[in-house]
Amino acid sequence: MKTKHRFSTQFFLLIILFFSFNASAKETKIPFKKWWIPQGIEIFKKAYPDIQFIPTYDKEAEDWLVTIIVCDAKNPQKKHQEDLYWCDSKFLPKDKLDQKDNYRPLLYNYSFTVPDPNTFTEQDIQLIKEFTDRDNRKNSPIDPPFFYDLVYDCTNRESTERHIVSIPFLTLNINVHERIKEPLERVSKKIMALPRDEEMTKFLSTLTRTDGYAWRTVRDTQSRSFHSRGLAIDILPKNYYQRIIYWSWQKQLRPDDWYMTEISKRWAPPKKVIEIFKEEGFIWGGTWIVWDNMHFEYHPELLVD
């Protein structure tokens, strides 16, 4: 799973042509949506093949109501089911539809390339400053929790911790949600099987900590961290090779221009390690504008072909 999901140009042209041959957008709105299931729902079906997604168009809400059926992680014969509205990949319950602007979509174009500060324009810099402003982050839309709460049974701390398991990972152990136990074990096995060249030898021999489950929110936001679901891991090497590893720590040292930190001055795992994580459905935080180079999250929906 390597490429970004995005609507094709042909698809947009088809939409334009469809509406251009109809006299009223109001007359065509419901029939069009009734027969055209959003591409994003198909992305989730591919990303989570063991989960059922049954979409039905709700004329009153003018949106797709998706029945999601999940097998219990501990007892596959037991099923959990919930109806959530698609709402541009926010997966909201009916009583949250009037608050949809408070949530951001779960699907976005994940970048595989680290943004190079040498290419930033003045406009880019202004946007970065606004995005990372503490007040803006506190008051910005949050990640909707409803889909993940259903899939991982992690509505609260007690329910989450019923599913946390400890597994060997690389040269250490880590606590994660049991649903990602197998993909993470495959990651570990593939990495340990890589040829021990100088880069890999240094990477494995200097690995001092791997952090998984931790109950917390994302820094400066109201969104739950993926660590609090047991779906994220941090890989920390000894002394970070004397490099920078996390945007917020750098911002404390250089509050006025932290975003201009050269890529060469940031620690990063070997590219082959990042690639193995991607193969198993994990995104790397090093390509975010708010780069978190130690961080990996399980998001197979962002990596679907």
PLM features: what roles do these ranges have?
Residues F12-F18:
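Hydrophobic helical h-region of N-terminal Sec-dependent signal peptides
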Residues E199-R216:
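Acidic, glycine-rich low-complexity/disordered segments
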Residues D135-F203:
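Active-site acidic/histidine clusters and adjacent loop/turn architecture
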Residues K2-F11:
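Bacterial N-terminal signal peptides that target proteins for export
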Residues K45-K46, D50-N136:
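Solvent-exposed N-terminal domain segments of exported/luminal and surface proteins
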Residues S20-N22:
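N-terminal signal peptide c-region/cleavage motif recognized by signal peptidases
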